[in-house]
Amino acid sequence: MFASLSSAWMLRLKKYGYWIWLIAVLGIPLSYWWSLGSDYPNAWPWLVISVVFGLIPILDAIVGRDPANPEEASEVPEMEAQGYYRVLSLATVPLLLGMLVWSGWILAHETRWDWVGQLGWILSVGTVMGAIGITVSHELIHKDPQLEQNAGGLLLAAVCYAGFKVEHVRGHHVHVSTPEDASSSRYGQSLYSFLPHAYKHNFLNAWRLEAERLKRKGLPALHWRNELIWWYAISALFLLGFSLAFGWLGAIFFLGQSVMAFTLLEIVNYVEHYGLHRRRLDNGRYERTTPEHSWNSNFLLTNLFLFHLQRHSDHHAYAKRRYQVLRHYDSSPQLPNGYAGMIVLALFPPLWRAVMDPKVRAYYAGEEYQLTDTQRI
């Protein structure tokens, strides 16, 4: 639909189109208000999650792809220097946290919902916190300014996944697309095999990496300068606050939306790196990370919602680039739909493998010998 636009018009469209994330955040209170007086009060809490995973994949196919890249010499420096894009991403933080607290209050006081409506509410809020909150935190923790670092950490603390702040930058980006990385799914590996290992390894590896950082400074692992202690303490304060304010239902709400949010994150990791690997060189090291080591998805609509997260190939090759100047590479392996559609597909391993395994084999045509059991484990 928009692929024929000139690069200049596409960049202008996206500059203001990134505010589309507000639809996801406002979808939570809107779904509640629309439920008032409804004959089906337990259906409305499921609205957001239903739209994300039911309607968005269809809209991605209709709206189409975005091939436009900013011009490297003239447009990229100007766009990276514009404070507008930073304000846009940082604006998500107070609105998401406000939405989270308000949603907990609604769950604790809404008497028309039975467990079905309550479950839909928790999953919908978790979907927004995962899709928007963790996506923005991912953008922020890669940047140097302390404000952005702290804002990203706060969003992760709000979903009990602060370890991502350490492990993603110092672990995943170092070992991506190798057997050493728990966030890089192997060829032939199902989502349900991937998730438990990702949860466990990424939590433990975050603590290991932070302990190593402190050791280099001559400090013990359990030291007040261990940032994970502080971030997890904030998560504990969130839990305590929700429990005191909204009772046991508030605690379930906070923990439930957290699990939904960080599970979405790990499913996206599964999608982003499935079956791709960096070759081991003669010296025992792995080849340098390039845009060819992550799946790219260039569907415009979801890229606007997710701050160009789907241009993941460029992100891994150049992690410090800001979201507004991430590039599309035709040479990168390409996903057949946006992340929402790919997440749904990943939930059904036979369908996932029927679609994705041929794409992996085609991408490594002539090098299929690398897709062995040893590469998968």
UniProtKB/Swiss-Prot annotation:
Pathway(s) this gene product operates in, as recorded in its UniProt entry: Hydrocarbon metabolism; alkane degradation
The enzyme's E.C. designation: 1.14.15.3
Q: Which UniProt keywords apply?
A: Cell inner membrane, Cell membrane, Iron, Membrane, Metal-binding, Monooxygenase, Oxidoreductase, Transmembrane, Transmembrane helix
Sorted alphabetically, the Gene Ontology cellular component annotations on this record are:
plasma membrane
Which GO terms of the molecular function aspect are on file?
Answer: alkane 1-monooxygenase activity; metal ion binding
Q: Which residues bind Fe cation 1?
A: 138, 142, 168, 172
Indicate yes or no for the key word Ion transport.
no
What does the UniProt record say this protein does? Catalyzes the hydroxylation of n-alkanes in the presence of a NADH-rubredoxin reductase and rubredoxin. It preferably hydroxylases C12-C20 hydrocarbons.
What is the name attached to this protein's record? Alkane 1-monooxygenase 2
Q: What organism, scientifically named, is this protein from?
A: Pseudomonas aeruginosa (strain ATCC 15692 / DSM 22644 / CIP 104116 / JCM 14847 / LMG 12228 / 1C / PRS 101 / PAO1)
